[in-house]
Design a protein with these regions (language model features):
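Generic hydrophobic/aromatic pocket-lining and core-packing "Φ" positions
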Residues: 71, 166, 181-184
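His/Asp/Glu-rich mid-to-C-terminal helical/loop segments that flank catalytic regions of hydrolases
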Residues: 205-240
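Flexible, glycine/proline-enriched loop segments at strand-loop-helix junctions
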Residues: 56-61, 118-131, 154-156, 170-174
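Active-site rim beta-loop-alpha module in soluble metabolic enzymes
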Residues: 128-171
Length: 240
């Protein structure tokens, strides 16, 4: 079992397409759980579980992901601590492609929040708990240097942002993606601790006058696959 500050813990991971291409979790048992929002497939080993947010069949684009089912599944399985890895574009020159950062806040204005409260008058201010991030950042160093307290800007997807959109949102945050804000919203409502890790696959469209080179983007995604495998290997060692 993983042990943190003297307490045994169970940790669930949420990741994306890089996990589908990884052999790291090939020996984990595939299971399914029913939720009020649909069935969720996940992988499990010991005290840990892994959800591929895009699914294990035909990968769902970001705007079609069943976020409520994914988070409800983890809550129903008894997990409290969630570590999420999200692919992002960098909005800052000082966060080059290949960087891993942790976000402590987010902006999600295009779609509005994800919520479980369709028939209840409930609200509250969502947070990214990041309760495991200090441990992970300290223990992953010096192999991984992970800047913290970054701001995640969420757009709907599945297309990349226009240059004009990037000019607007550069002042809003540090990285841009399509998934983390909804997960953080729902984890807050469900009482789960959401821990943010974000891996930059590219500079955002038009940053410093550049355009996205999709050939280079695909090559970097492949290169980042090795980094993702190593990151999860180390996290599993740290968390037990």
């Amino acid at each position: 079992m993983g042990k943190y500050l003297g307490h045994f813990m169970r940790v669930a991971f949420i990741s994306g397409t890089s996990i589908v291409n990884s052999t790291l979790f090939s020996s984990w048992e595939v299971r399914q759980v029913e939720t009020p929002y649909g069935r969720v497939a996940y992988k499990a080993r010991g005290d840990h579980a892994l959800i591929n947010r895009h699914g294990y069949g035909f990968p769902l684009p970001p705007h079609s992901i069943n976020y409520r089912a994914n988070i409800r599944a983890l809550a129903d399985l008894g997990f409290k601590d969630i570590v999420s890895l999200n692919s992002v574009g960098s909005l800052k020159p000082e966060i080059p492609p290949g960087s891993i950062v942790s976000c402590s806040d987010y902006v999600c204005l295009q779609q509005g929040p994800a919520t479980f409260f369709d028939t209840e008058l409930k609200g509250g201010a969502p947070v990214i708990a990041n309760n495991l991030i200090p441990l992970l950042v300290a223990r992953l160093a010096p192999e991984f240097t992970i800047p913290t307290a970054k701001v995640y800007v969420q757009m709907r997807g599945p297309r990349f942002e226009t240059k004009a959109e990037i000019r607007v949102v550069r002042a809003w945050g540090d990285v841009i993606g399509m998934t983390a804000a909804h997960e953080a919203d729902l984890c807050s409502e469900a009482g789960l601790n959401y821990n943010s890790l974000a891996l930059a696959d590219n500079y955002a469209n038009g940053l410093e006058g550049t355009e996205i080179d999709f050939a280079k983007f695909k090559d970097l995604v492949k290169t980042n696959q090795e980094k993702v495998n190593r990151l999860f290997t180390r996290m599993l060692e740290i968390l037990g």
